[in-house]
């Protein structure tokens, strides 16, 4: 274009009705020859648009064909061989999606419905297998924690000992009330009356040979008490023993450090040691802290002496 002069007019490509090209120059115009032609731009005659790339040009000359799509061949029906209509070997067409493929986002479509990760819950079978295969380390940690703190069992045993002392005082008050009522009834009855008629409420106590032991009584008092027994005191001691057993069972259930048999044996040993220490401390401080009349042991021993004072010494010796 630069070689052309400034006054030169560009040539225009003309296409006739029959499709032939014709060049119209200024000389032809001057000559007066006018043809009935139609002016068509060059780019409109191209089949691929206004600008044709190199790739399109190469592709138009090369014999390229699209890749063949994967096709799944259906197996012949196996109804002749088996009762079911399902094929013997499953194909990929039967698989909707693979649960193990987490990063295969290229294969997902909008209609794909698969469970999300945060909504997935393990089945009960998986939970059972996991609990059976994997050891439960949490229980072992709790057991070790209980072993590191033996003071918890000592505190519980001290609480049990305090409850036992409260029960002993209540037993002493009950026995004292029963003895007072029996003394009022025995004053109006003559001494010559038969023993069974004078004390009908305590008849079964003479026939029974069961003996009871109270922890705060000394060895001398135990010898005196073992010779005689009372139905009310036996019942109270039985209830006391049941309550102690229930407390011991609760402590064994709460403690996870040892098995049932070992924990029960250890707890009984701890209770025995604490009981001995408490007895020594109680007997050392008994004269300073407690009055003789308010002491449960003294009350029970005094009531027993008054209760069996009407017995004949010969019958007591024979028993």
UniProtKB/Swiss-Prot annotation:
Which Pfam family is one of those matched by this entry?
A: Mito_fiss_reg
Map out region (Disordered) in residue numbers: 1-35
The alphabetized UniProt keywords are: Membrane, Mitochondrion, Mitochondrion outer membrane
Its family remark reads: Belongs to the MTFR1 family.
InterPro entries reported in the protein's UniProt record: Mtfr1 (IPR007972)
Q: Which GO terms describe its cellular component?
A: mitochondrial outer membrane
**Species:** Xenopus tropicalis
Q: Where does it mainly reside? A: mitochondrion
Compartment(s) where it occurs, according to its Swiss-Prot or TrEMBL record: Mitochondrion outer membrane
The record describes its membrane topology as: Peripheral membrane protein
Q: What does this protein do?
A: Mitochondrial protein required for adaptation of miochondrial dynamics to metabolic changes. Regulates mitochondrial morphology at steady state and mediates AMPK-dependent stress-induced mitochondrial fragmentation via the control of OPA1 levels.
Q: Does the keyword Protein biosynthesis apply?
A: no
The protein in question is named: Mitochondrial fission regulator 1-like
